[in-house]
Amino acid sequence: MIHYVIPARKDSKGIPFKNRRLFEYTAKTIPKKEYNNVIVSSDDEHILLTAKEYGFKTHIRSQDSASDESSTKDFMSEIINDMSLVGDICMLYLTYPQRTWKDVCEAYVFFNQLEAKSLLCKEPLQTHPYVCLYELDNSKGSQVISHDLCRRQDYPKCFKICHKIAILKHDEIKKLNSNLYNKDTVYFSID
């Protein structure tokens, strides 16, 4: 059994009510046969009403898990407990309107083929961490990763985590960090 969880907070620091605008992009990609497996969690009555119009299940997100300080893990733990979710859970953030249902299906196949317990997506880096420095006082800096390499060809391959699609076994949540990964997480590449 797979549950598709869509987190949709009401407040946004950058663009007011952005999730109201983004919700339709995600909702329209989900096939009708999956509607009964979709749970929209929000503290926004408008989004919850729209979700019900689609036939999705709804969850009223607590103030704690909807705050700016709460982590993705806090939210996922809450919905797993509140809704008594068992099995696989796929989280679909609204901030990826270019995500397709094909992407979701391919990620789930990848997850199952590797017999994974958690999955995030990965993206290419724009800037390698070997050329990043911590900013110090007096216009100085300190390497984020200590090394003495100058040729980029010698740098280890790196990627950036991405929550375009996150999949996890319900009982894995306690073993994940605040960003939903650990040493056993697998990473799915979406171009």
Predicted regions and their residues:
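N-terminal glycine-rich phosphate-binding loop and ensuing alpha1 helix
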Residues: 2-41
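A structural signal for isolated positions on well-ordered beta-strands in alpha/beta enzyme cores
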Residues: 3-5, 37-39, 90, 119, ...
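Short beta-strand/turn micro-motifs composed of small residues
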Residues: 6-8, 42-43, 93, 122
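Histidine-centered beta-alpha loop that forms part of the nucleotide-sugar donor binding/catalytic region
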Residues: 9, 63, 123-125
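Short phosphate-binding loop-to-helix
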Residues: 29, 45-90, 98-106
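Short, high-confidence coil segments that cap the C-terminus of an alpha-helix
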Residues: 35, 85-86, 115-117
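Conserved core of the sugar-phosphate nucleotidyltransferase
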Residues: 74-75, 97-184, 189
